[in-house]
Amino acid sequence: MHRFVLALVVFAGAAIVWAADDAAHEEGVEWTGKPWMGKWESDPSKDENVEEFKKKLQLPMSHSEMNKNSKVWIHHYKKGDEYHHKIIINDAHYKNDIVFKLGQESAGSYNGSSFSVKYEDKDGALVGSVHYTGTKEQSLDKTINNVFKLEGDHLVKTSTIEGVTMKRHYNKRQ
């Protein structure tokens, strides 16, 4: 009985943490309005050229803990006039919420690495770039061009850096 109660407490605690981190419970959050908005879960079996892309990226943020079967969750939502691009990779212990306004450059950072993003909505796709400038110790000048586009009922992210392109396919989460 003691193990059951302990397991129940751990499960309930994890559920509370997950719910508290979920923007769906925040007032004023919009999950619809653009085809690419919503909660998305990657399907690693459909990924294309991810390992080659990670090699070209050569950043601390390239998530060395990830393997080819690691799932990536993306939450695209709007709060006020700001959009959020939240990335969650549990295998890599990575979580980042990138906040931006369409058509404007926004600064961001993670784990000491600085970057800027600029996204636009073009014909129902989220199109833009992420420019990495590096850390205090290591200056970088790398730009990733991203397109998030709905294909049928799946979101496809196409990313290109220095001539190397990867595709990641996402299924809509409820």
Curated annotation (Swiss-Prot):
UniProt name for this protein: Secretory-abundant heat soluble protein 2
Localization in the cell: Secreted
Primary role: Secreted heat soluble protein acting as a molecular shield in water-deficient condition. Tardigrade-specific intrinsically disordered proteins (TDPs) are essential for desiccation tolerance by forming non-crystalline amorphous solids upon desiccation, and this vitrified state mirrors their protective capabilities.
Region (SAHS-c2) residue spans: 77-105
UniProt cross-references to InterPro entries, sorted A to Z: Calycin
Protein source organism: Ramazzottius varieornatus (Water bear)
Annotated family: Belongs to the Secretory-abundant heat soluble protein (SAHS) family.
Additional facts recorded: Trehalose, a disaccharide essential for several organisms to survive drying, is detected at low levels or not at all in some tardigrade species, indicating that tardigrades possess potentially novel mechanisms for surviving desiccation involving tardigrade-specific intrinsically disordered proteins (TDPs).
Residues that carry a glycan: N111
